[in-house]
Amino acid sequence: MKTLTRKLSRTAITLVLVILAFIAIFRAWVYYTESPWTRDARFSADVVAIAPDVAGLITHVNVHDNQLVQKDQVLFTIDQPRYQKALAEAEADVAYYQVLAQEKRQEAGRRNRLGVQAMSREEIDQANNVLQTVLHQLAKAQATRDLAKLDLERTVIRAPADGWVTNLNVYAGEFITRGSTAVALVKKNSFYVQAYMEETKLEGVRPGYRAEITPLGSNRVLKGTVDSVAAGVTNTSSTSDAKGMATIDSNLEWVRLAQRVPVRIRLDEQQGNLWPAGTTATVVITGKQDRDASQDSFFRKLAHRLREFG
């Protein structure tokens, strides 16, 4: 009898432990698979593609790749002597037409004062027309001078904001064309996280919700806030043919891949360029408040760590 009781007790204890383990594993699995999280997240930043507004030979490059620069710091300089001469020529034209306009103004004024008693109306009108033509040429010369001055100013390429120079691919002696990208500037203090959440998890994602960001290869957990959720993504299953008719791709009803929607997350603290734009991270949306990690069970902590590996 005692042996039977002992066997039943062992069986009951084993059964209870198995049930508890199953419940714990099930809860961890649900937390792991259904909570709003994704490993498909990337650090992003505001990037300015810097291109000159003038063409010419690059005479000086004042920075090196990956350098932190300040706003208005000189990055490189384009052939200034050519644009200085263009400005001098434009200023000479302005000076010439100013003198000519003064002469024609005096001539027209003299004829207007004498009137038709001394000369014909045609001669008076001709003097006034010549004055208007010269004034028009003067205005055109002044506009050309202003453009030449602007071009000269833009031979010096400056940083539009504080940030890091990256992908610098220009060197002194090269010819650069107008509008061609010379360097990219990653703006300082503009980093954020772009998380691509599955549509099945968007119910738990709202602007203002808190988020945890774990950079790939790091045990450090950053904090952030959901800034916005994209209003739409491209429908790859539907296109238009040459006549504008809709073309719908065939689909298997029992296989449905969840679409991923971009979610922008604002970081609580900027980390400089410790995690460059484009690097990956794991994002967990914790809801309206931050998660208290100290209260997590072993299985919850295990599930949280498993997110790093898939």
Swiss-Prot record:
**What is its membrane topology?**
Single-pass membrane protein
Q: Which Pfam families match?
A: CusB_dom_1 (PF00529), HlyD_D23 (PF16576)
Annotated Gene Ontology cellular components are: plasma membrane
Alphabetic keyword roster:
Cell inner membrane, Cell membrane, Membrane, Transmembrane, Transmembrane helix, Transport
Q: What is its main location?
A: membrane
Q: Which GO terms describe its molecular function?
A: transmembrane transporter activity
**Highest taxon of source:** Bacteria
Show the InterPro entries listed in the entry.
CusB-like_dom_1, CusB_D23, MFP_Efflux_Pump, PHBA_efflux_pump_AaeA, RND_pump_MFP
Asked whether the keyword Cell membrane is assigned, the reply is yes
Record's keyword annotation contains Membrane: yes
What subcellular compartments does it reside in? Cell inner membrane
Spans through the membrane:
12-32
Q: Where is the signal peptide?
A: none
Tell me the protein family, please.
Belongs to the membrane fusion protein (MFP) (TC 8.A.1) family.
Q: What does the function comment of this entry state?
A: Forms an efflux pump with AaeB.
What protein name applies here?
Answer: p-hydroxybenzoic acid efflux pump subunit AaeA
List the source organism.
Salmonella arizonae (strain ATCC BAA-731 / CDC346-86 / RSK2980)
Q: Which gene encodes it?
A: aaeA
